[in-house]
Swiss-Prot record:
Species assigned in the record: Arabidopsis thaliana (Mouse-ear cress)
Keywords attached to this entry: Coiled coil, Membrane, Nucleus, Transmembrane, Transmembrane helix
Protein name: WPP domain-interacting protein 2
Function (record text): Mediates and enhances the nuclear envelope docking of RANGAP proteins mediated by WIT1 and WIT2 in the undifferentiated cells of root tips. As component of the SUN-WIP-WIT2-KAKU1 complex, mediates the transfer of cytoplasmic forces to the nuclear envelope (NE), leading to nuclear shape changes.
Gene this protein is translated from: WIP2
Sequence motif: Nuclear localization signal 2, positions: 47-48
Compositionally biased region (Basic and acidic residues): 166-186, 229-240
Notes concerning its domains: The KASH domain, which contains a transmembrane domain, mediates the nuclear envelope targeting and is involved in the binding to the SUN proteins.
Expression tissues: Expressed in seedlings, roots, stems, leaves, and flowers.
Subunit note: Homodimer, and heterodimer with WIP1. Component of Ran complexes at least composed of WIT1 or WIT2, RANGAP1 or RANGAP2, and WIP1 or WIP2 or WIP3. Interacts with RANGAP1, RANGAP2, WIT1, WPP1/MAF1, and WPP2/MAF2. Interacts with SUN1 and SUN2. Interacts with KIN1. Core component of the LINC complex which is composed of inner nuclear membrane SUN domain-containing proteins coupled to outer nuclear membrane WIP and WIT proteins. The LINC complex also involves nucleoskeletal proteins CRWN/LINC and possibly KAKU4 and the cytoskeletal myosin KAKU1. Interacts with WIT2.
Cellular component, GO annotation: cell plate; nuclear envelope; nuclear membrane
Record's subcellular location: Nucleus envelope; Nucleus membrane
Segments carrying motif Nuclear localization signal 1: 44-45
Transmembrane segments: 485-505
Biased composition (Acidic residues): 241-256
C-alpha cells in the first residue's frame, strides 16, 4: 500500500507538472522534490474507484469540495516545512485522497468557466490533455499566486504572518474589484434592458440561461457523484488545519473561481444568452430606427407631424420600458416553460415591430389631417389680421400726431421746470445776501452803542477824578492848618513851663 500510494502521488505530480512549473516561476522559491523510489514491483497507475450507490445533494457535495480544497491549500501554505518528505502509511493515504480532491475541485472550477469545456477533470486520467489543463489553470490562478505541488506542501521562504496578511489583503482587494465589476455589469445590463428590450427578448434569454444552467447542474451532479468517494475520504482531516488559513484560502479560492468565470465569460464561445438577446434586439431596434427615419424624410414638409410622431414613438418606447420591466421580472421569476418560446420569440418580435410600424403610419395620417386643419385656421387668422390693419391705418396717423404733441409738451414742461428751478435758486441767493446785510447792520449798531457807552463811562470817570483831586487838596489844606495849630500850642506850653518859678524842695542831709 505504501508503494502504491507513493506511486499514485508521484503520477499525479507528473500530470500537474505544467501547473507546478508555472507557479514555481512565480514564487521564485527553492523547493526540494522527493527522489523517485524504485523499490518494490515498480510504479502502478492510480485508478479511481467510483461508487455509484452513494448519492449526495448538490449543496453537501459543493461544501465537501470547498472543505477539501481548504485543507489542501492550507497545507500548501505551511511555512515551517522546508523539505518534502514521505509520511507514514495513514498520512500517505490521506495525501492520495487530498490529491484526488484537489484535482476534483480543479475540475469543478474549469467546468464552471464554460459549460462547453466539460466538468469532469480527473488527475491521473487523460495524461495527454494534462498540459492544456495545467496551462489554463495556471492562467486562471496567476493573479492569486497559489502554491501547489501535487498533494505535498510547497514552501515559501518568507514569514508565515506576512504571507497570511498579504494573502488576506490580496483576497479582499480582488473581492472588492469583483463586486464592483459585478455591480457595473448588472447596472449596465439592466439599463440597456430597460431602454432597449422587450418581453420576448428577455423570455428568450431567461429560457436559454435556465436551460444552460439545468444542463450545467446535471453535469455537476454527475461529476459530484464521481467524486463522492474522495470527498468522503478527505472529510476526516478537519482538525489538522487552522481557522485563519481556512479563511484566507477560502477567500483566495472564491476570488480565483469567480475571476476565472469572468474571464471565461469574456473570452469563451458560449456567451451569456442575455447579452446575445440584447444584441439581437439592438440590431432590430436599429432597423426600426432606419424605417422611422425614412418616414420622417417623407414628412419633412410637415414639422408638426414629426413632433407628433416623436411623441407617439416616445409613448411606444415607454411601453417598451414597461415591457422591459415585466420581462426583467419574468427573467427573475421565470420557470422551465420559457424554454419552449425560444424559437417563436424572434417571429413574435418581428410581428410586434410590424404592428408598431402600422400603428405609427396611422398616427402619421392623423397628424397630417390635424396639420391641414391647423393650416386652414392659420390662413383665416392671417386674413382677419390684414383686414384689421387696413381699418386701423387712419387711427395710427392720429395716434402719431398725438404722440408728437405729447413729446413736445413734455419737452416744454422740462424746459419750464428747469427755468423755474434756476429762478428759485437766484431768489434764494438774494435772500441769503439780504440776511447777510442785515446781520452786518446789526453788528454795526451794536458797535455804535458800545462806543457810546464807553464815552459815557469815560466822562463819568473824569468827573470822579476831578472830584477826588479837589477832596485831596482840601485834605492837604486841613492837614497843614492842623499841623500849624499843634506847633503853636506846643510852643505855648513850653513857654509856660519855662516862665513858672521852681519849687523849693527840702533835700535831706
Amino acid at each position: 500500500m505504501d508503494l502504491e500510494s507513493e506511486s499514485s502521488v508521484l503520477e499525479s505530480v507528473e500530470d500537474n507538472n505544467g501547473l507546478i512549473g508555472d507557479l514555481d516561476k512565480e514564487l521564485n522559491s527553492p523547493v526540494e522534490t522527493s527522489p523517485l523510489i524504485s523499490k518494490g514491483f515498480g510504479l502502478r497507475k492510480w485508478k479511481r474507484r467510483l461508487r455509484r450507490d452513494l448519492v449526495k445533494d448538490d449543496t453537501s457535495v459543493s461544501m465537501e469540495n470547498s472543505k477539501a480544497l481548504k485543507r489542501v491549500l492550507s497545507g500548501l501554505v505551511d511555512p515551517n516545512a522546508k523539505q518534502m518528505h514521505l509520511p507514514g502509511p495513514e498520512v500517505r493515504q490521506d495525501s492520495v485522497g487530498s490529491v484526488g480532491s484537489v484535482n476534483s475541485v480543479v475540475g469543478f472550477v474549469m467546468g464552471g468557466e464554460s459549460y462547453g469545456n466539460g466538468l469532469a477533470f480527473a488527475a491521473g486520467v487523460d495524461s495527454d490533455n494534462s498540459e492544456d489543463r495545467s496551462s489554463t489553470m495556471s492562467h486562471s490562478w496567476d493573479k492569486h499566486r497559489g502554491k501547489v505541488s501535487g498533494g505535498k506542501s510547497v514552501i515559501s521562504s518568507g514569514d508565515s504572518s506576512q504571507q497570511r496578511k498579504s494573502s488576506v489583503e490580496k483576497s479582499n482587494k480582488l473581492r472588492g474589484e469583483r463586486i464592483k465589476i459585478e455591480k457595473e455589469n448588472s447596472h449596465s445590463s439592466m439599463e440597456s434592458a430597460d431602454s432597449r428590450s422587450s418581453n420576448f427578448v428577455f423570455m428568450q434569454g431567461a429560457s436559454y440561461s435556465l436551460s444552460s444552467r439545468e444542463q450545467g447542474g446535471r453535469r455537476m451532479m454527475d461529476y459530484d457523484d464521481e467524486n463522492s468517494d474522495h470527498d468522503a475520504h478527505t472529510s476526516k482531516r478537519k482538525d489538522n488545519v487552522e481557522e485563519e488559513e481556512e479563511e484566507t484560502e477560502d477567500y483566495s479560492q472564491g476570488d480565483c473561481v469567480e475571476e476565472s468565470q469572468i474571464k471565461s465569460n469574456g473570452s469563451s464561445d458560449n456567451l451569456d444568452p442575455l447579452i446575445v438577446a440584447v444584441n439581437s434586439f439592438q440590431t432590430l431596434q436599429e432597423a426600426l430606427q432606419k424605417e422611422l427615419q425614412k418616414f420622417q424624410e417623407l414628412g419633412k414638409e410637415e414639422p408638426i407631424t414629426s413632433l407628433h410622431d416623436g411623441g407617439e414613438s416616445s409613448s411606444c418606447i415607454h411601453a417598451g420600458h414597461e415591457g422591459a420591466s415585466e420581462a426583467s421580472s419574468s427573467y427573475r421569476f421565470g420557470s422551465e416553460k420559457m424554454g419552449e418560446m425560444e424559437l417563436t420569440s424572434l417571429d413574435s418580435e418581428i410581428l410586434n415591430l410590424v404592428n408598431n410600424v402600422e400603428h405609427l403610419e396611422i398616427k402619421l395620417e392623423e397628424a397630417k389631417r390635424i396639420l391641414e386643419v391647423k393650416e386652414t385656421q392659420i390662413r383665416e387668422l392671417e386674413s382677419t389680421i390684414n383686414v384689421s390693419e387696413t381699418c386701423n391705418g387712419g387711427t395710427e396717423i392720429g395716434i402719431e400726431d398725438i404722440f408728437q404733441q405729447k413729446v413736445e409738451a413734455e419737452i416744454e414742461y422740462i424746459i419750464f421746470s428747469r427755468s423755474v428751478g434756476n429762478l428759485k435758486r437766484r431768489i434764494k441767493l438774494i435772500e441769503e445776501e439780504k440776511t447777510l446785510g442785515l446781520s452786518k447792520l446789526d453788528k454795526a449798531e451794536t458797535k455804535a452803542e458800545n462806543l457810546k457807552n464807553q464815552a459815557q463811562d469815560l466822562q463819568n470817570h473824569c468827573v470822579e477824578i476831578t472830584e477826588i483831586q479837589e477832596v485831596e487838596c482840601l485834605k492837604k489844606r486841613a492837614f497843614k492848618t492842623t499841623r500849624c495849630l499843634l506847633l503853636q500850642l506846643g510852643l505855648l506850653f513850653i513857654l509856660y513851663y519855662s516862665l513858672l518859678p521852681e519849687p523849693e524842695i527840702a533835700v535831706p542831709t
